[in-house]
């Protein structure tokens, strides 16, 4: 029963556009009432109606140690007693920057912002300032936040609503954005043939906003070569995959080295944080050292920094966490695949570290066109059955799922039982 959530949603609709502060949360693509959450604990969410859910969304990725993680909460509460934000430099910013930079040979310096959108927007501005060029290349289905020049065939919520671009974005803002097809190097070559003014190519090396779709190694290698040949920077958008797929994010799965990297989600431990980093030569162009302006009132705020430090230090101290989480993710989707096969339901699955994805699709998914061939009507029915049974998957076919450390094999077995019940009801 979701009677209290239904009443809460109606009240929210009076004051908030669509009743939500991020469109996908409204459940428009899957139907039904979005549960209004009262609290989270470990692998669980509890709504205001008293229902418990095994949570595979984990706030869309940040909570690798689960909800209300004790160590993170203690660090946040201790810092909050000292102050929430100062608008000044603090030791904490340097500490978190050092922890991240030490892991990556291609990152000498990093700057913190308050969201993934800000991180990507700032990285692209820096790439343009560094190269003196205006154009950028992005891939259909990759989501890089909601800044105007990037809200073009953006996947995620835009794909869910059948609106791959957004009204309110002037054509002049997007004329410098060239679109390529994910895992299709020929489409990237055509972009470089069309423009000699390309500053950067930005890609989710593990796409998570058209469902989970990893970039193929050969494709990334060819992409690196093209960027080098044309003097363009290669940006890995790891807002989602950073510290989620592995300790080095997607870079733990490829030999390809990007020029710039954006981060978010996990590095904030559940607090609003984004970041972008590169080698010193590039970052030197950023103000106040260089001419490329970027700023933020709450950037590097101490509460977010201690939350991030709590998470990143534990991950660095015990990187075997990723092996455990990957094994659990494989157990989940492997079991799901067997159940789906037994019912004759087409299903494609994939895993990268603690990230997983599944498509109700006849064929393997390698790009956005493939993803859009998935059975969205079946997904909606499946999602409704899972919510009824206390399983909280992302409310869109075009989103990745996440495993947290408290989500153990017992809970995965429980999930598989509910999946079997749900598919039996639908089929």
Curated annotation (Swiss-Prot):
Presence of the UniProt keyword Coiled coil in the record: no
Family stated for the protein in its record: Belongs to the class-III pyridoxal-phosphate-dependent aminotransferase family. HemL subfamily.
Protein name: Glutamate-1-semialdehyde 2,1-aminomutase
Gene Ontology molecular functions: glutamate-1-semialdehyde 2,1-aminomutase activity; pyridoxal phosphate binding; transaminase activity
GO cellular component terms listed in the entry, alphabetical order: cytoplasm
GO biological process: protoporphyrinogen IX biosynthetic process
Necessary cofactors: pyridoxal 5'-phosphate
Organism domain of life: Bacteria
Positions where N6-(pyridoxal phosphate)lysine occurs in the chain: 265
PROSITE patterns named in the record: AA_TRANSFER_CLASS_3
Entry keywords, A to Z: Cytoplasm, Isomerase, Porphyrin biosynthesis, Pyridoxal phosphate
NCBIfam families xrefs: hemL, PRK00062.1
UniProt EC number: 5.4.3.8
Pathway involvement of the protein, from the record: Porphyrin-containing compound metabolism; protoporphyrin-IX biosynthesis; 5-aminolevulinate from L-glutamyl-tRNA(Glu): step 2/2
Family annotation (InterPro entries): 4pyrrol_synth_GluAld_NH2Trfase (IPR004639), Aminotrans_3 (IPR005814), Aminotrans_3_PPA_site (IPR049704), PyrdxlP-dep_Trfase (IPR015424), PyrdxlP-dep_Trfase_major (IPR015421), PyrdxlP-dep_Trfase_small (IPR015422)
Subunit structure comment from the entry: Homodimer.
Gene behind the chain: hemL
Intracellular or extracellular location(s): Cytoplasm
Reaction equation(s) it catalyzes: (S)-4-amino-5-oxopentanoate = 5-aminolevulinate
